[in-house]
Swiss-Prot record:
Pathway as given in its UniProt record: Amino-acid biosynthesis; L-histidine biosynthesis; L-histidine from 5-phospho-alpha-D-ribose 1-diphosphate: step 2/9
Enzyme class label: hydrolase
Protein name, as recorded: Phosphoribosyl-ATP pyrophosphatase
Lineage, opening ranks: Bacteria, Pseudomonadati, Pseudomonadota, Alphaproteobacteria, Hyphomicrobiales
Cellular component annotations (GO), alphabetically ordered: cytoplasm
GO molecular function, one term: phosphoribosyl-ATP diphosphatase activity
Localization per Swiss-Prot or TrEMBL: Cytoplasm
Keyword DNA-binding: no
Keyword Nucleotide-binding: yes
Catalyzed reaction equations: 1-(5-phospho-beta-D-ribosyl)-ATP + H2O = 1-(5-phospho-beta-D-ribosyl)-5'-AMP + diphosphate + H(+)
Organism this protein belongs to: Sinorhizobium medicae (strain WSM419)
Major localization listed first in the record, in broad terms: cytoplasm
EC nos: 3.6.1.31
Family: Belongs to the PRA-PH family.
Length: 107
């Protein structure tokens, strides 16, 4: 079992985002801007769904890794720390999913 975390990935993305675009895919994606990065995130999301439907475990693992990586890039460009997302998840999971959804729909 690996000890690699999403926090580790966030740090790697932040470091690589500061590199020269010709030296790093992450830097190239960041330099292209949020619209390009978000489009790539959407493509990876679709590929993850297709892998899930296809019942191909290895492909689903691979596409999920791509999806998480591209999410970290999008969050980096938006200057949203992973901790903000984790805090929101913690808040949402402190109650049932149905109650949380009702609260969002009726603030």
């Amino acid at each position: 079992m690996t000890e690699f975390t999403l926090s580790d990935l966030e740090k790697i993305v932040a470091t690589r985002a500061r590199a020269a675009p010709e030296e790093s895919w992450t830097a190239k994606l960041v330099a292209a801007g949020q619209k390009k990065a978000a489009k790539k995130l959407g493509e990876e999301a679709v590929e993850t769904v297709i892998a899930a439907i296809g019942d191909d475990r290895k492909n689903l693992v691979d596409e999920s890794a791509d999806l998480l990586y591209h999410l970290m890039v999008v969050l980096n460009i938006a200057a949203i720390p992973l901790q903000d997302v984790m805090s929101e998840l913690a808040r949402r999971t402190s109650q049932s999913g149905l109650q949380e959804k009702a609260n969002r729909q009726n603030p």
